[in-house]
Design a protein with these regions (language model features):
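Charge-lined substrate channels and their catalytic hotspots, especially those that engage the 3′ end
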Residues: 2-286, 293-339, 370, 377-380, ...
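Electropositive polyanion-binding surfaces
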Residues: 2, 70, 177-178, 182, ...
Length: 705
């Protein structure tokens, strides 16, 4: 049959179509040139440009009036829609499904958007992606699946990748399936360019997607956590670790009562402590920290390794150290009955716990005891057996003085407004094969809190000393809540029945929050209030610029006490050695402090993500054997898509709103999910049944019983 010649030809490019496209592009360039010529930024011009130039090159009046062009970062959802974050805009721009132009989570995109008033009178924004400026994600991890309508052909089938990350709603087609089976978990390189088709090239096959090993390896790869060191790095560490320990030129504290207290399984012992009571009731607290910078010279392989890794990472079954084990568990670790190089903060405290004076000295110690938290707690609460009492008999008088000082510091910190927002921590118990057989809530006693208080005191003293001496430092900072988040939190607290009239909605103090938490504890509502308080606050980070630490209520604070496992502490040690002790010019280390702060902040986020995901993996594996069981749980979070519920074993999971039965709506203002008959709130106790344990995504699904 003869085709109608008047119809468009989609099969090949015609000369006329080519001319039209060239004309359209020419008009676009001329318009941008004209706008730049009159001082308008073509990146922020408030009209449609490319897609809204019609066949005659005209732009509608509505577009010129209402629509804005801007560039931002795209965040996608599993449902296909997304949001774009713009600088200067309080709220993200909504991008409906079908208007993302193939953008993937993390891409930098050019969008056109408009603002409108919803039926409720709220001003909202909506837009569409017109161009992907740069690709944020280079690879994707997922499970290989096959359908006749998707992916690379093999025996009549086509293969595609179902991403582990639910935010990637487009399933990329595999360009090759050699050595790959359906059900394998792989990492693949994304092939971009076609906005309506996403492809990927296999890079690594981790194994069967339901296996623990495959998921573990995939998480490490996705978060960029490297397990092994190179031969050169190991050799350099071994060389420096072999250096003999000599007391010359250092404060010799080997005759003092100095010891460590740490977890039973810890091998990287950063810190040791000592305490003396002075005349007039004052205290001399010694916090002796492994002198790691001595073993990690500037510009060495190890120095670059520390900058790249940024932190040790603590998984359920292993520790991935920042430095090779010959240092982290060997030469630097303050093992008992071994001479060790340390950097000692000798701090004089008043009888009320106020810092009166602080000295920082290179030193040599010989720890007399390898203390364990559980054993020291047993001594404190009177349950220690004869074996424990015999082990600690030489230091029990010192421990009693230390506990007295800890209680003084605790009272001082509370009065200052330091916030205690402890979330439940899990202790996952593994059998000989590395399989979890039980999960319990980790308890913190006075021994853990004592060490924490002493380390906090040392960190504050060191930061203050460096600041007062105008010496660079890698500060630990925590900004106060932003006014909009603070206002939302105070509204929630007010609706819960708390008096918030004494707190400004523009700015609050740590004491304000501490007062609210105290009131919540009296009412038995500390969990929901703590959760919403955490949501209102920014995350702590590192900075070369001094800023307050809101959560601790301190004006000067740094991390000094864990240089084996944290770059921030190692950098601060190096600056102390080079500038404070050796007298080098402070400005020589200002840029180093900035680089270290940025690298440490990035590494911390990476490590926290990996630790959380590995922990969730083990929790899901453990709970796979308990599907169908019922648990008493606490509503730990409320969102538009359901309730998060946490049983006593901390294995948190979602009850989808669609499975609650009846017609429920999410009340964002009061953080509740309600129907006409029922209301679910943060902190409610509910009975749940485990319905699903998804090892691929590391998630649990419950239902209300």
């Amino acid at each position: 049959m003869k085709r109608n010649s008047s119809k468009k030809s989609f099969g090949k490019r015609t000369e006329g179509n080519t001319h039209k496209r060239k004309s359209k592009e020419l008009r676009r360039r001329e318009l941008l040139k004209m706008l730049d010529g009159i001082g308008q930024s073509s990146d922020n011009v408030k009209i449609k440009i490319s897609d809204d130039l019609g066949r005659r090159g005209r732009t509608s009046q509505k577009a010129r009036r209402d629509e804005i062009s801007a560039e931002g970062v795209f965040s996608s959802s599993k449902s296909g829609f997304g949001f774009v974050t713009l600088e200067g805009e309080e709220r993200d721009i909504f991008i409906p499904e079908g208007k993302t132009r193939g953008a993937v989570d993390g891409d930098r995109v050019l969008i056109i958007y408009h603002k409108y008033e919803s039926f409720s009178g709220e001003i909202k924004t909506e837009g569409r992606v017109v161009e992907i400026v740069s690709y944020g994600r280079k690879t994707v991890i997922g499970t290989v699946e096959a359908e006749r309508s998707f992916g690379h052909r093999k025996g009549g089938k086509r293969f595609f990748l179902v991403p582990d990350d639910a935010k990637i709603s487009i399933y990329p087609e595999l360009t090759s399936v050699e050595g790959i089976r359906v059900g394998d978990k792989i990492e693949a390189k994304l092939i971009r360019g076609n906005p309506y088709k996403l492809e990927c090239e296999p890079l690594v096959n981790f194994g069967r997607t339901e296996s623990r090993e495959a998921n573990y390896s995939a998480i490490l790869s996705d978060t960029g956590i490297e397990i092994d060191f190179t031969k050169e790095e190991e050799a350099e560490a071994a060389f420096f670790a072999s250096r003999p320990v000599e007391a010359a030129g250092r404060l010799d504290l080997r005759g003092e009562t100095v010891f460590t207290i740490d977890g039973e399984g810890a091998k990287d012992l950063d810190d040791a402590i000592s305490l003396k009571r002075l005349r007039g009731g004052a205290y001399e607290l010694g916090v002796h920290i492994a002198d790691v910078s001595y073993y990690v010279p500037e510009r060495s392989h190890l120095d670059r390794v520390a900058m790249a890794r940024g932190t040790s990472v603590y998984f359920t079954d292993k520790v991935v150290p920042m430095l090779p084990k010959s240092l982290s568990n060997g030469a630097c670790s303050l093992n008992a009955d071994e001479d060790k190089y340390t950097l000692s903060a000798i701090i004089k405290l008043s009888r009320n716990g106020e810092i009166l004076e602080a000295k920082i000295e290179p030193s040599v110690i010989r720890s007399s005891l390898r203390g364990v938290y559980s054993e020291v707690n047993a001594i404190f609460d009177g349950t220690a057996d004869e074996k424990i009492l015999e082990k600690y008999k030489a230091v029990i008088p010192t421990l009693e003085k230390m506990r007295s000082l800890y209680l003084i510091l605790k009272d001082k910190n509370e009065k200052r407004g330091a916030l205690e927002l402890d979330s439940p921590e899990a202790e996952i118990l593994l059998d000989g094969a590395g399989v979890p057989y039980d999960i319990i809530k980790r308890e913190r006693g006075d021994a853990e809190k004592l060490i924490e208080a002493f380390m906090l005191t040392a960190n504050e003293a060191v930061a203050t000393k460096l600041y007062d001496a105008k010496i660079p430092c890698v500060y630990r900072i925590h900004e106060p809540p932003a006014p909009d988040k603070l206002s939302d939190f105070l509204s929630y607290a007010h609706n819960m029945g708390f008096d918030t009239s004494y707190i400004s909605r523009e700015k609050c103090s740590p004491q304000d929050f501490a007062r609210l938490l105290s009131a919540a504890e009296e009412k038995g509502l500390s969990l929901p209030l703590s959760y919403t308080m955490l949501r209102s606050m920014s995350k702590a980070k590192y900075s070369a610029e001094r800023m307050d630490h809101f959560g601790l209520g301190l004006t000067k604070y740094c991390h000094f006490t864990s240089p084996i496992r944290r770059l921030s502490d190692l950098a601060t040690h190096r600056i102390i050695h080079k500038v404070l002790l050796e007298g080098k010019r402070p400005e020589l280390y200002a840029s180093y402090a900035k680089r270290a702060a940025a690298a440490a902040s990035e590494a911390e986020l990476r490590a926290l993500s990996a630790e959380r995901r590995i922990e969730n993996l083990y929790k899901v594996i453990y709970m796979q054997g308990r599907i169908g069981e019922e648990f008493s749980a606490t509503v730990s979070s409320v969102s538009s898509f359901g309730l998060f519920c946490m049983p006593e074993n901390t294995c948190e999971g979602l009850v989808p709103i669609s499975e609650l039965g009846g017609s429920f709506i999410f009340d964002e203002k009061n953080l509740t999910i309600r129907s006409r008959e029922l209301v679910y709130r943060l902190g409610d106790t509910v009975r749940v049944r485990l319905e699903e344990a998804d090892i691929i995504r590391g998630k649990l699904r419950y239902s209300i019983v």
